[in-house]
A protein has these predicted regions:
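EAL-family c-di-GMP phosphodiesterase catalytic domain
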Residues: 1-5, 32-33, 49-51, 101-108, ...
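Alpha-helical scaffolding segments of alpha/beta enzyme cores, especially the outer helices
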Residues: 81, 112-116, 143-153, 199-206
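Catalytic core of bacterial c-di-GMP phosphodiesterases, primarily the EAL and HD-GYP domains
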Residues: 34-41, 67-143, 219
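Structural preference for long, well-ordered alpha-helical segments in enzyme cores
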Residues: 9, 42, 61-62, 75-83, ...
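Inter-domain helical "communication" segments and dimerization helices
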Residues: 1-23, 67-70, 80-81, 88-89, ...
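Active-site core of bacterial EAL-family cyclic-dinucleotide phosphodiesterase domains
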Residues: 2-61, 160, 217, 243-247
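Nucleotide second-messenger and two-component phosphorelay signaling modules
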Residues: 15-19, 31, 49, 85-92, ...
């Protein structure tokens, strides 16, 4: 008997969206030199049958069966709706970064979808940061360049996520015009003990600044890491040292109401 796994997964995805099982979490980013709120990254969890399923479990499945664009759009629309609410409550809007999968970024309807969402929720594009990964770019550099140019024309911020985890990081900086570079956690795990690691980190930050690219250090967990990043003028920090990913309501209470 042939089992149509894609059909089953698609039905679960639709049901999950209808029942609000997919929950948005926000992890704040902070300016390194001041410690003030700089923005946040939108992350998603699946509250399935009372259990919280992490994205590393379900995202690969949605990608495998080419259903990820539905989830991408769901997250992006939720962030646009959230920013609309913040504006009505007269909160100061901070940029929220949203991951863009390869299938979504290269979809022929991608730009029209972005325009529709911006118009529907009256969102300023420069408060939305669209993240692409090295894998996305490597798959098709020309399509990635075209997508980057198109979203920039609309006014969105473009960032490179998980920088340093692939094999062509520096080549991508040459080909893709990004605004923000997110250095992967692996750079900083042993940074205080690794002279070679420090040289590489400092070179990446210096090079990025010369290209007018801001740098976010991801996965920061200790005070010593923070002090080091201050000294080398990294722009922003994200990690458990400051805050874990939290629900939207908690983010608003802790950061937006007093921002």
């Amino acid at each position: 008997m042939n089992i149509d796994y894609r059909k089953i997964l698609e039905e679960r995805l639709k049901k999950g969206i209808k029942n609000n099982e997919f929950v948005i979490y926000l992890q704040p980013k902070f300016y390194t030199n001041t410690g003030k709120l700089a923005g946040a990254e939108a992350l998603i969890r699946w509250n399935r049958d009372g259990k919280l399923v992490m994205p590393n479990i379900f995202i690969p499945l949605f990608e495998k069966y080419e259903l990820i664009t539905v989830l991408d759009t769901y997250v992006l629309e939720n962030i646009c709706r959230l920013q609309q609410q913040w504006r009505k409550q007269e909160y100061n809007i901070v940029p929220i970064s949203v991951n863009e999968s390869r299938l979504h970024l290269y979809n022929e309807n991608h730009i029209n979808d972005l325009i529709d969402l911006v118009n529907k929720y009256n969102v300023q594009p420069n408060t939305i940061e669209l993240e692409m990964t090295e894998t996305t770019v490597v798959h098709n550099v020309e399509l990635a360049k075209e997508a980057e140019k198109n979203v920039h024309k609309l006014g969105f911020i473009v960032s490179m996520d998980d920088f340093g985890t692939g094999y062509s990081s520096f080549s991508m900086l040459k080909n893709i015009n990004i605004d923000v570079l997110k250095m992967d956690k692996s750079f900083f795990d042993d940074v205080l003990e690794s002279r070679r690691g420090k040289i590489i980190i400092e070179a990446v930050i210096e090079m990025s600044h010369k290209l007018n690219i801001k740098v976010v250090a991801e996965g920061i967990e200790t005070k010593e890491q923070v002090e080091y990043l201050k000294n080398i003028k990294c722009d922003m920090i994200q990690g458990y040292y400051f805050e874990r990913p939290i629900k939207v309501e908690e983010f608003e209470e802790k950061y937006m109401k007093h921002y």
